[in-house]
Design a protein with these regions (language model features):
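Conserved catalytic cores of very large enzyme subunits
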Residues: 1-194
Length: 194
């Protein structure tokens, strides 16, 4: 009951103002994703770099205020991933067989680099680890999980990624920042956005 009341309070807040907590921010991300799926007959709609834009909320609640513990944050991520599985798009039987059901190819990206004062800095943070751990524990087909790899990535995070890959459910995928970023820049994307 308390959890449902908190979810209802979160809905009241995020309907009229910016989220204040990690839970509210994650709930808002889910609602936005759901709206995009409904409005555009969604397919391959990405959450983007979730560990970057949700980290200020996670940091405040889990690391600074300790109003939310890490395990509960991972449980909230589990709930979000499970809710994503409820969204379905009718497909042919052959597609469903080849794709382990009817995935919508919703992608979450973690890791990579951020441009800070013109210098590329490793962007891995504690939420990157929590998202990775959540996906590794749940072993679900959705969301697809991608890691932006670069040579400056810590061995600890790389090892954590390899441990999840060893679970055998095909994630995370790796994208190479050192290849992809220059190509985005060639297309006219600003370096801080590439």
């Amino acid at each position: 009951r308390d959890e449902l009341l908190t979810m209802a309070e979160n809905c009241d807040v995020i309907a009229h103002e910016p989220p204040k907590t990690f839970w509210q921010a994650l709930q808002l991300c889910y609602f936005i994703q759901l709206i995009l799926q409904i409005e555009s007959n969604g397919h391959s709609v990405s959450f983007g770099r979730m560990d970057q834009y949700l980290y200020p909320f996670y940091r405040r609640d889990v690391e600074l205020n300790q109003s939310l513990d890490r395990e509960h944050a991972i449980e909230l991520l589990h709930s979000c991933w499970l809710k994503l599985l409820e969204v379905n798009k009718i497909r042919s039987g052959s597609h469903s067989k080849a794709s382990a059901g009817s995935p919508l190819y919703q992608n979450v990206t973690i890791g990579g680099q951020n441009l800070v004062s013109g210098q590329a800095m490793d962007a891995v943070n504690p939420l990157s680890y929590a998202i990775l751990e959540s996906c590794g524990r749940l072993r679900s087909t959705q969301p697809n999980l991608s890691v932006r790899y670069h040579a400056g990535m810590s061995n600890d995070f790389l090892d954590a990624c390899v441990q999840v890959i060893r679970c055998g459910f095909g994630m995370p995928a790796f994208n190479n920042d050192e290849i992809v970023i220059p190509e985005f820049i060639k297309l006219g994307i600003e370096p801080q956005d590439a």
